[in-house]
Amino acid sequence: MVSPRESTPLERLPLSHAGLYSVQDGTLFCGHQSGFFSTCSVTLWHIAEVLERTGEMPRRIDFSRAFRWFRNAEQTRDASDMYPLFFRPGAVDATRGLTWLPRVRYHGLYRWIDYQRFGLVMERYFQPSEKARAFQSQWIARYGIDPAKTIAVVYRGTDKSTELALASPRAYVDQARKILERHPDFRILIQTDELAVRDLFVEEFGSRCFFIEDMPVSRHGVVVHELDDASLQRDRGEFGVMLVAVTELLSRAAFVVNHTGNLALWVCLWRGHSRGVVQFDSTGGLVDFGSVGFYLRQGRHLAERAWRRLVPQRASQP
């Protein structure tokens, strides 16, 4: 294996967001440090960048410089490559013939994802590892999970409000209730980083709602992966494995009430389509392509984004 330090300048291709590609052996090194699925989304950008600049797909992915918050002390000391702990590669032929990959938008509308292209990438690079599959098997047995009769609710709180507008937890409750009224034999799986939101769903739906008890939650608005080891109460590398396991499991549900963010994006990427997905967008509103109000809200949001980009440019002019 060639490490970033061993490659010569002519063999290294610097990428955006602390990425590096070894032209010699086709290894993609990701150095992005953020939330788990933020790092995964940036890796997708890297793959697209390598394909655009070299005409080839990376042969392998190396996460020895990434996932700072998702490695234990030994893995940190040894600069372990975390890829094989979290993921399992699929067939190399899966992406044969792929000549272009769009830049995935984690704050976008998930209905418009190019699922055909990204499905090939997911198949080749991002199959859940055997450890992740083992967690899934345990949870399916423990909770009697039947994905075909499950409504997954994915609510991301804590610091997410600093990035975008959030719909209220009650709005998620309302959407879950509407689906449950149409499918009274279904159950709700609530996955959230906020204890108060989890408690709300249990209070509203009682025995028809359940959650994965192994997944940590925050009680004070602290981002879960930034909790200290005593509060997290689990091995950090194992926590990363569980994030892969629970997110891919959520993707299999018959219905998903989803937020907008990196984890939400990866639910859809593993799902491979947006059918049965209810999304609250980056404005905090419900994505409804049949509503005039939705288009007005999106237009206003895009205009505000364009204005924010224009104002600094105008201010910098003499």
Cite the ranges covered by each PLM segment.
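Secretory-pathway glycan-assembly enzymes, especially type II membrane glycosyltransferases
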Residues: 2-183, 187, 198
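Low-complexity, flexible helical/coil segments
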Residues: 62-65, 185-193, 224-227, 291-298
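Short, solvent-exposed polar/charged micro-motifs at secondary-structure junctions
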Residues: 69-73, 162, 199-200, 219-226, ...
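Hydrophobic transmembrane alpha-helix bundles
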Residues: 95-106, 219-236, 298-307
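Active-site donor-binding loop signature of nucleotide-sugar glycosyltransferases
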Residues: 155-157, 214, 282
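Donor-binding and catalytic core of enzymes assembling or modifying cell-surface/extracellular glycoconjugates
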Residues: 186-280
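Nucleotide-sugar donor-binding patch of glycosyltransferase catalytic domains
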Residues: 262-318
